[in-house]
A protein has these predicted regions:
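Rossmann-like AdoMet
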Residues: 1-142, 146-156
Length: 156
């Protein structure tokens, strides 16, 4: 099974060796990938799109809700920056799509620091591809239910 090509930004997502080694379950829908699909992202699989269709059948406004959530994220980061907050910990960060915390923060304050944390292997692998070697931005695979483990993780 392959990831969907295209997406809101018109790019493609190729499965990295890191993602393949991460033990991705291609047969089970995943919340991070469903959210990515509902935002128009490109890192989701047929099983995720099928589940999203079921969700949309029950709640046709769900894609709008996801976009509203993303809009709130942008406003919240901008507000924090305007008030001197320059360090961000994004727990359950999901699959990177347009308008990520680091894109917003670094556009306004290049010295800002962003740590992404997610447990889902596809989200973490794709985040590593998107983030690359950006200074002041880290990606960590950890379970946010283990607060001490998250805070002790390298990069956080």
């Amino acid at each position: 099974m392959t990831a969907q090509s295209g997406g809101a930004a018109g790019g493609t997502w190729r499965e990295s060796e890191r993602a393949l080694e991460a033990g991705i379950d291609y047969d089970r829908a995943n919340a991070a990938r469903i959210y990515d699909y509902l935002l128009g992202g490109a890192c989701n699989f047929a099983v995720d799109r099928e589940q999203a269709s079921k969700i949309l059948a029950q709640n046709p406004d769900m894609a709008y809700v996801c976009r509203a959530n993303r809009d709130f994220l942008r406003r919240a980061v901008e507000w924090c920056l305007a008030h001197g907050i320059t360090q961000f910990l994004d727990l359950g960060s999901g699959v990177p799509t347009a308008g990520n915390v680091h894109e917003i923060a670094l556009a306004h304050r290049p010295e800002a620091r962003v740590a992404y944390v997610d447990f889902e292997p596809v989200a973490v692998a794709h985040a590593h591809e998107v983030i690359g070697g950006l200074e002041n931005v880290s990606v960590t695979r950890a379970d946010m239910r283990d607060a001490q483990g998250v805070l002790a993780a390298p990069g956080v």
